[in-house]
Amino acid sequence: MKLLRRWWGVIPAALLVTIVWPERAFVPIWDGSVYMQCVVDAATTGLNVHSLRCGGHQSQLYMGLLALTQLAHPGNLTAIVAMNLALALGALAAFNAFLRKLLPGETWWAERALIVTIIAVHPLLAATLVQLNSDFGVYVFFAMSLAALAWRRYRLAAVAGLMLCFSKETGALIYFAALGLHLLFRALEAQGSVMDRVKPVVRSAFPALLPLIAFAAFLAWWSATQGSYAVWNQGIHERPVEGMHWFDFDDVIFRSYAAIIFILGFAWVPASALLADFAIGALRSVRRMGSRALSGVDAPLAAYLTALTATLAYLLTVYRTWSFPRYFVVLAPLLLLAAFISAVRLGAGPRARRLILVAMVGLMCTANFCSWDPVSRAVFGTISLGERRAYDVSSIAHDFRVTDADHLCYNLQFTGFHWAQNAMYAAMKPTSRTTIVFPRFNRWGLWAPLDATTFVRVARAAQTVMPDYRDEAMVAAMRDTMPRELWLVEQPNDGDTLAVQKLHHDYADADSARYTAHGLTLTARHLVRRNAEVLPSGAHR
């Protein structure tokens, strides 16, 4: 038993690596393509505050770590995945440290081990790790900041907090909330007047305040010297503050956010425990029955955890944009931790707790590769990917012209878009003169160079071929110089793009082929110019 306890930490790490490592050649798509290109370009042209502002976010420190992996060989995706895995393992260690504070003693070792395992195999973690984005940096450095604050290691909190603030603007907001609540709870525990409580707390925790001071100073410098907004806006709103909806709880985007946080991918399981605990607590409060004991649990830290979870659930839904699950990746472990405390408060014994946690490990492992949660299917509906189905995450808000894009990045099924395209390109063997058309509203982040030998999608520039990628509007604008033939790529998430109808004005169907990989199927339609001589097979190459 002692040996098992000593080496259990290897199991979550091994499971995460086993889940993620097979996707190390995945070339990020959609928004992930923007971040990938930013990192590669920064490594090529030079690392600075501008080149590392990826996707319009103040992400310099996290993206800087990824860019370091590209200095020797730009476009090395394996190095990026390896760096993200190393950071993820650091986050798991941080959550374990937090749990040792929350659930101290050897009597809780099995629960701590199982909770860390659930966090490690959570499908949203794997999806956010593989699909390059700044939210993964927020997740990692939030975990480290949380553990440092719980143990009152304020210098470590300062380092982790600085990385968190410069991973994404929401990272600074999250750190502000985590640190602010921490200081508040410490002050409430102290004795004396307000000033007598606040002064020693602020004095001892002052190093942890430095990241917020540095971030505020940086934003002030940016606003004074640069021509763009200091925080991400991306043209959605005339001013970033206009995206804030502090008290609008009847907004369709808010409803979509709430469903993602509390339902998507078995999130309703921990959410149900929280809801039951809240209902019973409210009833007991009305009846003035007193508080329920949390035997063996650090009660003040448990209260802090609950308050932080509720605060972040609110703050992360205030700014309304798109229904991308990665925006809420930090809430996944918090929801699990808070739900476990609720289960303890509800009276679940050790055997019941451990059985539930073991079941959750199984659910999360399988949820990485398929979308079989019946509640999520009922709430979101599904779309067919070919051999499998995925949750239609955009169905509530309908915030995209296509059916789903980064909405699908809640588990690893979305990587099938990359692998199915690889199968198509390997069969086509395109050259730079081969015209490949993606629908105008479903080409974002999908055009990539191909390896000159294997024709698989890659991120590097050397020894590659770049097909003549276009959309239907670009083809129509060519007029007399339209290619004799082209291939239209139809994907499961196209929606109503009308690309085929528009191309049929000038092109007729010749044939088509379907390509399937990782359960996802796409179709390549071969179209030829009307009244134009058709080249012999292979002559286009």
Q: What is each residue range found by the language model?
A:
Residues 137, 141, 167, 173-174, ...:
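Hydrophobic/aromatic-rich transmembrane helices and adjacent perimembrane loops
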Residues 41, 181, 185-188, 200-277, ...:
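Membrane-lumen/periplasm interface segments of specific transmembrane helices
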Residues 12, 110-113, 159, 208-212, ...:
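Signature aromatic-anchored transmembrane alpha helix within multi-pass, membrane-resident enzymes
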Residues 20-30, 44-67, 71-78, 238:
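Membrane-proximal lumenal/periplasmic loop motifs of glycosylation machinery
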Residues 56, 60-64, 72-93, 113, ...:
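Loop-to-helix entry region of an early transmembrane alpha helix in multi-pass inner-membrane enzymes
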Residues 94, 137-156, 160, 185, ...:
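Specific aromatic-rich, kink-prone transmembrane helix
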Residues 149, 360-444, 536:
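Membrane-embedded, lumen/periplasm-facing catalytic core of multi-pass transferases
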Residues 29-30, 127-135, 324:
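Short acidic/glycine- and proline-prone juxtamembrane loop motifs at membrane-interface regions
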